[in-house]
């Protein structure tokens, strides 16, 4: 089962938690769900170059709090915060509520599955050889502390007549073990020959205690220098 299911969905409530954190009555649930989908789609399309890993949406009473995890926060914030203010106003219009925006910097994008998948997809669109792109990503992840990584590329790779799937793995990626911290990300490369899919699994170690936000804590943990490894920019 672990081979087929989304590793993040399998671990929800164990060492992962939801990216949308709010409660709504049945009458409001559908509208808020579609709002969340629209917000994520807009942010990912508008900030394609900002290497966004995930967008977390929380809804305190009649408000909306959006947290964006990005490897390039400067592209989101803009000169003197002009771009982030423009984005905040747009999100306020979409939600019809007072919206605050937090930007969290990812200091090790080389071991973030979503960012790795996006990077490989962009390379495929630039006609970089898929094996070279996969191998480079695997080597970078293992060098920066990943315990294992697997990458799948599928489609008309290299312009081949028949679509196929190629994969590359290094280290171990235990998909059945619930205590393992496995990050998972996907991306699509729109090439001249059609769409190629990219899937990435990154094993970052084991989380032994029960903690639904343990994986999130790891992404904002203190670095070796003693200072916070993630920089936050808050705009209310």
From Swiss-Prot:
One of its GO terms (cellular component) is cytosolic small ribosomal subunit. One of its GO terms (biological process) is translation. Signal peptide: none annotated. Pfam families: KH_2 (PF07650), Ribosomal_S3_C (PF00189). InterPro entries: KH_dom, KH_dom-like_a/b, KH_dom_type_2, KH_sf_prok-type, Ribosomal_S3_C_sf, Ribosomal_uS3_bac-typ, Ribosomal_uS3_C, Ribosomal_uS3_CS. Keywords: Ribonucleoprotein, Ribosomal protein, RNA-binding, rRNA-binding. PROSITE patterns: KH_TYPE_2 (PS50823), RIBOSOMAL_S3 (PS00548). Binds the lower part of the 30S subunit head. Binds mRNA in the 70S ribosome, positioning it for translation. This is Small ribosomal subunit protein uS3.
